[in-house]
Amino acid sequence: MPRLLHPALPLLLGATLTFRALRRALCRLPLPVHVRADPLRTWRWHNLLVSFAHSIVSGIWALLCVWQTPDMLVEIETAWSLSGYLLVCFSAGYFIHDTVDIVASGQTRASWEYLVHHVMAMGAFFSGIFWSSFVGGGVLTLLVEVSNIFLTIRMMMKISNAQDHLLYRVNKYVNLVMYFLFRLAPQAYLTHFFLRYVNQRTLGTFLLGILLMLDVMIIIYFSRLLRSDFCPEHVPKKQHKDKFLTE
């Protein structure tokens, strides 16, 4: 009798429901004064809390996977470990949850960049989940979550109007370093690796297309980060006021 369900589907469902339950639990926490008075900021705050939790867990998990299976740094297509596979399923579940959360909360227009990113990320992760290829690439991609820890702290402090706090000023420099080490560097390394699939009709070619689009998004985000934190006089005060990604 043919198997009707892929064994990864329960893992994806379980991860998605875990993040849903986590969001409900985090919604019980007290809110900063500047957040609780604004429904949009309240939603952003809760959304970022879940993102923060995901970044901490998956960022540390990705580092452990690379440490346990260093072949993932070289054999990006074929290297595999159970821990790495579960990590990719875990993060795919987060992206499914966050996509549903954004759409269900009516933030699709304000958060369209996040939705595009999530769709591309899920497309890449599903190749590792359902075809057991490029699991190593998925783990290396998730090193970005180490950078996201500090990026999320930055966004949460901006939402709560704490830009003048010492922690914000320290974090903006740490965030810049982490952006280079765990976002730009891994992305450049992966792009260089996947360029070998140019002119081929393979799964690697599909993933190269996703990587190139993510490259563009990462460069745009980096320019926004520099402009907002280091050249604030060049940021129009009312520009993108309602965007989920605060600059």
Swiss-Prot record:
Protein name (record): TLC domain-containing protein 1
Gene: TLCD1
Record's subcellular location: Cell membrane
Species name: Homo sapiens (Human)
Transmembrane region(s): 47-67, 84-104, 174-194, 202-222
Topology Extracellular: residue spans: 36-46, 105-123, 145-173, 223-247
Major localization class: membrane
Signal peptide: 1-35
Cross-referenced InterPro entries: TLC-dom, TLCD
GO CC terms of this entry: plasma membrane
PANTHER family xref list: CT120 PROTEIN (PTHR13439), TLC DOMAIN-CONTAINING PROTEIN 1 (PTHR13439:SF5)
GO BP, sorted A to Z: membrane assembly; phospholipid homeostasis; plasma membrane organization; regulation of membrane lipid distribution
